[in-house]
Structure formats: C-alpha cells, structure tokens
Amino acid sequence: MNIDIVCVGRIKERYLTDAIAEYSKRLSRYCKLNIIEVADEKTPEHASEGVGRQIKAKEGERIAKHLKDGAFVIALAINGKQLSSEELAAKINDLGLRGTSHIQLVIGGSIGLDDAILRRADFLLSFSKMTFPHQLMRVILLEQIYRAYKINAHEPYHK
C-alpha cells in the first residue's frame, strides 16, 4: 500500500520531527510512506473570514496539485467521521481488499482545509471535536496508521 500524508507547512520542532521519523521507520515494514509538505500562507492575527478563505484557497491549490487520480483521499476535518483505532484499521484493510493501492491523507494548515479539498475527499476523518495543532496532528496520524497496521497484522502493540 502506498500512503501519502499531504500536509501544509514545515515542522521545525525537533521533538516532532523525531517522532515523525520514528513512526515513518516503523511503518516502512507495512507500507510505502511519503510525506508531502506544501508551503503555508502567513495568517495574520485576527484575520477576517474573507482573508481566511483566501488563505485556505491558496493552500488548497497547492494540496490539489499532489492529489492523484485513483488514490483514495482522506481529509482530516473536525466535522468528519470519528473512528476507533479498530475501525480505522478495518477501513485501511477494506480499501486494500477492494484493490486500492494508494491512500492520501490530507492535513490542513492552522485554519483548516479549503472546501474544494473537502469536496474532493472520498472520506472525511475526525480525530476529535477538539482542535489540535496541525504539526502535532502529523504525529498523531502516523501513530494511528501504525497502530492500524499492527491491529491488522495481529501483532502486539494495540491495547
């Protein structure tokens, strides 16, 4: 399975890059992982709704350039469907059984994803009704993908 994480912005914090590197290494046993970073837009403090839409549109255009025909696109969105770890594992397994060989997971920037990306997605996934920093979300997402593969392989890790 090919899995792309398409995300906005670069991560500068060492503790996050270390965690991303660790989960990327662990996942290499199970899938071909590719992390694609697109440039983020500077978001002014107290940006108006209109400015926010413009920022999301620019970031959305950059994301869209990396979305592949035939890939199953999962966008992370607060209004998406919440799944348990077991349900995410089953979803990944089912996609593979149905012949999907490429999954792309999209993480928006600090103000979220453009509506065009949300419409393009095949599935909207929410990790919580809470908001998380988009940089930290990469680590959380990678850990859950790793957990899903361990569940599907019936290997110890998941409790």
From Swiss-Prot:
Primary residence: cytoplasm
Record localization: Cytoplasm
GO cellular component terms, semicolon-separated: cytoplasm
Top enzyme class: transferase
InterPro entries listed in its UniProt record: Alpha/beta_knot_MTases, RlmH-like, tRNA_m1G_MTases_N
Record's catalysed reaction(s): pseudouridine(1915) in 23S rRNA + S-adenosyl-L-methionine = N(3)-methylpseudouridine(1915) in 23S rRNA + S-adenosyl-L-homocysteine + H(+)
Pfam families with a match to the protein in the record: SPOUT_MTase
Record Gene3D superfamilies: 3.40.1280.10
Residues reported in the UniProt entry to bind S-adenosyl-L-methionine: 76, 108, 127-132
Alphabetized SUPFAM superfamilies for the sequence: alpha/beta knot
Entry keyword Transferase: yes
UniProt EC number: 2.1.1.177
Keyword Methyltransferase appears in the UniProt entry: yes
Key words of the record: Cytoplasm, Methyltransferase, rRNA processing, S-adenosyl-L-methionine, Transferase
Entry GO MF terms: rRNA (pseudouridine-N3-)-methyltransferase activity
Protein purpose: Specifically methylates the pseudouridine at position 1915 (m3Psi1915) in 23S rRNA.
Subunit structure, interactors included: Homodimer.
PANTHER family linked to this entry: METHYLTRANSFERASE, RIBOSOMAL RNA LARGE SUBUNIT METHYLTRANSFERASE H
Family to which the UniProt record says this protein belongs: Belongs to the RNA methyltransferase RlmH family.
Name listed for the protein in its UniProt record: Ribosomal RNA large subunit methyltransferase H
Lineage of the organism: Bacteria, Bacillati, Actinomycetota, Actinomycetes, Bifidobacteriales
Gene behind this protein: rlmH
